UniProtKB/Swiss-Prot annotation:
Catalysed reactions, semicolon-separated: [ThiS sulfur-carrier protein]-C-terminal-Gly-aminoethanethioate + 2-iminoacetate + 1-deoxy-D-xylulose 5-phosphate = [ThiS sulfur-carrier protein]-C-terminal Gly-Gly + 2-[(2R,5Z)-2-carboxy-4-methylthiazol-5(2H)-ylidene]ethyl phosphate + 2 H2O + H(+)
Organism: Frankia casuarinae (strain DSM 45818 / CECT 9043 / HFP020203 / CcI3)
EC number: 2.8.1.10
Annotated protein name in UniProt: Thiazole synthase
Source taxonomy: Bacteria, Bacillati, Actinomycetota, Actinomycetes, Frankiales
Biased composition (Gly residues): 26-41
Molecular function in Gene Ontology: thiazole synthase activity
Family: Belongs to the ThiG family.
Principal location class: cytoplasm
Length: 337
């Protein structure tokens, strides 16, 4: 099991239990459809349907954030429960002087891949500066690019995001940009060399769900890199919906962190993400017209072929008696007792 860069060897505060256990048996196991995979195999061990970013395989299609948790230990338990293999952390929250002595990084299981983010950056220059600090502190060239100058909506600035992406790619970073759900911008980000595009589902931290579905479907249809739906997913069914329309992965933070039981919610999101992916791979059947039903079972010929006219008793023939014990009414009566 690899150690985070700059993290001293040995036991430290917040390390996950040696057996990988999690409260209430919520640990997220691996899955061929991305429902977990945060165990010893770790990123890079290719599976049947792994998420692949910049040529590297990850066993879970659920990415998870680290903000807003009540404590570092609650965060750690939720990370383990999620089964995620990629965890994002705001570079502004990392205290380089305290790494190994209670910093947030010390509570992230070492098997997880760190994805530093530039949360709080208001322009391309600041985002690049934060990314370089993160690379120096963590040793990773992965970066989740965020440029959000509007404090009210935290909407990504499309011009500064594209400019920052160009600068970061030129500087050797593997860039995963948070962006508006704009198919044209997504294509431009891919063209400058971003490893993914990460369109928002709704405003950051809003828990309002997938409000940009049509635009994300358009992005998925033309993207040549993984599409990761980021921001606003509020309940597990939102994650399932994003995966069902073809997203490669989802990133969730607030919905898990502010839940009454964060670890259990993390596991729920893992299962929903896996279910949505499996549903996408299975292929949805064509939707029928809104005003016409289509029976899933035949409406005639139950229990065999149609009886011939000769099998019906003639009016002159006595109708066979049916004993109470075998009459439909008797059967219903017996069953209801």
């Amino acid at each position: 099991m690899s150690q985070h860069p700059l993290r001293p060897a040995g036991s430290r505060p917040g390390d996950s239990p040696p057996d990988g256990s999690c409260p209430d048996g919520l640990a997220g196991g691996g899955s061929a459809v991305g429902g977990g995979g945060g165990g010893e195999a770790g990123p890079g061990a290719a599976g049947a349907d792994d998420l692949v970013i910049a040529g590297r395989a990850y066993g879970s299609r659920l990415l998870i954030g680290t903000g807003k948790f009540a404590s570092h230990r609650v965060m750690r338990d939720s990370l383990v429960a999620s089964g995620a293999t990629i965890v994002t952390v705001a570079l502004r929250r990392v205290d380089i002087g305290r790494i190994g002595d209670g910093d947030v990084l010390d509570f992230i299981p070492p098997s997880m891949t760190l994805l530093p983010n530039t949360s709080g950056a208001v322009d391309a220059a600041e985002a690049l500066r934060l990314a370089r600090l993160g690379r120096a502190a963590t040793g990773t060239g992965l970066v989740k690019l965020e440029v959000t100058p509007d404090p009210r909506t935290l909407a990504p600035d499309p011009l500064e995001t594209l400019r920052a992406a160009e600068l970061m790619v030129a500087d050797g970073f593997t860039v995963l940009p948070y962006c508006s759900a704009d198919p044209v911008l997504a294509r431009r980000l891919e063209e400058v060399g971003c490893a993914t595009v990460m369109p928002l589902g709704s405003w950051i931290g809003s828990n309002r769900g997938l409000r940009t579905r049509d635009a994300i479907e358009a992005i998925v249809a033309s993207a040549g890199v993984p599409v990761v739906v980021d921001a606003g997913l509020g309940v597990p069914s939102d994650a399932a919906e994003a995966m069902e329309i073809g997203a490669a992965a989802v990133l969730v933070n607030t919905a898990i962190a502010v839940a009454a039981d964060p670890a259990r919610m993390a596991r729920a999101f893992a299962l929903a993400t896996a279910a949505g992916r499996l549903g996408f791979l299975a292929g949805r059947g064509a939707a029928g017209p809104a005003t016409v039903a289509s029976a899933s079972s035949p409406l005639t010929g139950f229990l065999g072929a149609h009886p011939s006219p000769a099998s019906h008793p003639s009016p002159a023939s006595p109708v066979p008696s049916v004993s109470r014990a075998t009459s439909p009414a008797a059967v219903v009566g017996e069953a209801s007792r």
